[in-house]
Each structure stands twice: as structure tokens, then as C-alpha cells.
Design a protein with these regions (language model features):
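Proline-aspartate-enriched helix->loop->beta-strand connector
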Residues: 182-187, 191-214
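Redox-cofactor binding/interface segments in oxidoreductases and associated redox assembly factors
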Residues: 70-71, 129, 187, 214
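Active-site environment of divalent metal-dependent phosphoester hydrolases
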Residues: 59-61, 76-79, 101-104, 119-122, ...
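Core dinuclear metal-dependent hydrolase active-site scaffold
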Residues: 22-64, 114-180, 239-244
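Active-site metal-binding motif and surrounding structural segment of the metallo-beta-lactamase
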Residues: 52, 56-103, 180-186
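Bacterial N-terminal signal peptides
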Residues: 6-19
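N-terminal secretory signal peptides that target proteins for export/translocation
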Residues: 1-2
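Binuclear metal-ion centers of metallo-dependent hydrolases, dominated by the metallo-beta-lactamase
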Residues: 108-124, 201, 205-244
Length: 244
């Protein structure tokens, strides 16, 4: 049935990626197209450039070849060497923190761009800022954290004059509250690893993006996030991250 559906799409002149729900943001040089694939895996397109973020979940056979790949963390719902290979154009750079580079040694081909928390680079023509992502209090046991400071990166990328922030796995840390001029923020909200919807909403109120998109929320109620931001002036867009 899936093969038949893809065939119909092709006969209609559509890419199989059209099977994913899409969302657009007006930007200089054309709209930015956001395609949620699954959980924290997302495809971003602008002006002919394709960016794949955390290609580790969902049916990646429908994703477009990426000119740039971003990886936030070592956990399996963010990192998959096989997933990177599926969505990456030949020679496309992969941006990752040092901890991820250690994990993928010998499994992901160059070029690899390692970024540390707080660092800024332009890679494949895209300005990128690495934002700390970590837990403040939550962990598997007393005195332990699920995500330690410095291990993973959130990312702010700039496309067509718009700043998109992918938070990755994090609680509401001071570095997030200090973000400025964010147009679109992808915010996680699942327990026990990140934060509940109410806490994510309070975090968003601190740095005031124009649009907030919940992701990485399996099992959580996005309605709570929407309700908490009602009247804040922040637009909430709930996309289909868990297709059936």
C-alpha cells in the first residue's frame, strides 16, 4: 500500500516527502518549509537548500537529500549514523558536538564540523549558533543528570533573515532564557528527560519567540502548552510528529 501511494504521488508530480505534513514560514528569498518527520527529526528547506536535523527517527526514505545535517546529542532518538547516511548529500557537512563525534568515529564520513556550546560558525552557507542543552535537576539517580552541560548542542540557524532554534534535549536553562530575536522555537516537552509542557511554556515566555513549535513530546499533552501560552502573543503551531 505504501509503495502504491508513493507511485501515485510520483504520477501526480509530487515528491514522496509530500506524504509528510508541512508548514511554512515567510522569509527573504522564499518561504521556509518545515517538515516534521518524527519526534525530534525535522527537515527544513529554504531557497533550494535542505537541512536535516537529528535524522534518527521515522521513515527517512521520504526525506530529501540534505545539504547540511545537524545532530544535537548522543542519544538514539537524536543520533543515528545510518539515518545520517540516508538523508545526506554526498559531501554534505554534518555539524555535531564533540561527544557525538566520539560516538560516530569510523561510522560517519567527513566532512564533520564540531561545535562547542556558545560557538558560532557558518557551514554550507548557513549561520549556526550552538546553544547549551542540559538538565538542571532531572536524572536517572540522585546526583546524576540525563544530559550534562557541554555534551550536547541546541542550534540556532538563520535562513532568509529568520532565526530558527532547535532546543534538543534540555530543561529551561539560563542560556535558553537569554536567547534573542528567535522567530521559530522547537521546544521539547517530555518527562523524565526534558520538561513538562507547563515548564516549556514558561521557558518560551522568557525568550519570546514569534512562533513556538512543540516537538519531542511523545506522551505529553500539547494542549497544556497551548493553554499556558494563550494571550502571550506567541503563536503556537502543533505539527504531526507522530504519524500513524
Amino acid at each position: 500500500m505504501a509503495r502504491m501511494f508513493s507511485t501515485v504521488l510520483l504520477l501526480l508530480g509530487l515528491s514522496p516527502v509530500a506524504a509528510f505534513a508541512q508548514n511554512t514560514i515567510p522569509a527573504t528569498g522564499g518561504d521556509i518549509t518545515i517538515t516534521p518527520i518524527q519526534h525530534a527529526t525535522v527537515q527544513i528547506e529554504h531557497a533550494g537548500k535542505v537541512i536535516q536535523v537529528d535524522p534518527a527517527q521515522g521513515d527517512l526514505s521520504k526525506a530529501k537529500p540534505g545539504d547540511l545535517v545537524l545532530v544535537t546529542d548522543i542519544h538514539g532518538d537524536h543520533l543515528s549514523p545510518e539515518g545520517i547516511a540516508k538523508v545526506r548529500k554526498s559531501g554534505a557537512p554534518v555539524v555535531m558536538p564533540a561527544a557525538v563525534q566520539t560516538q560516530v568515529a569510523g561510522k560517519v564520513a567527513a566532512p564533520i564540523e564540531v561545535m562547542a556550546n556558545g560557538e558560532s560558525k557558518t557551514v554550507a552557507g548557513v549561520p549556526i549558533e550552538a546553544v547549551p542543552m542540559y538538565n538542571l535537576t532531572r536524572g536517572p539517580a540522585a546526583g546524576q543528570l540525563f544530559h550534562t552541560k557541554g555534551r550536547g548542542n541546541g542550534y540556532v540557524i538563520t535562513l532568509g533573515g529568520k532565526r530558527l532554534y532547535f532546543a534538543g534535549d534540555t530543561e529551561c536553562v539560563p542560556e535558553i532564557k537569554a536567547l534573542k530575536n528567535i522567530d521559530v522555537a522547537f521546544m521539547p516537552m517530555n518527562l523524565p528527560y526534558t520538561m513538562p509542557p507547563s515548564e516549556a511554556a514558561e521557558c518560551v515566555k522568557a525568550f519570546k519567540p514569534k512562533i513556538a513549535i512543540p516537538y519531542h513530546f511523545q506522551g505529553q499533552k500539547t494542549e497544556e502548552f497551548e493553554a499556558a501560552l494563550k494571550g502571550s502573543g506567541i503563536e503556537v503551531r502543533v505539527l504531526n510528529w507522530y504519524p500513524k
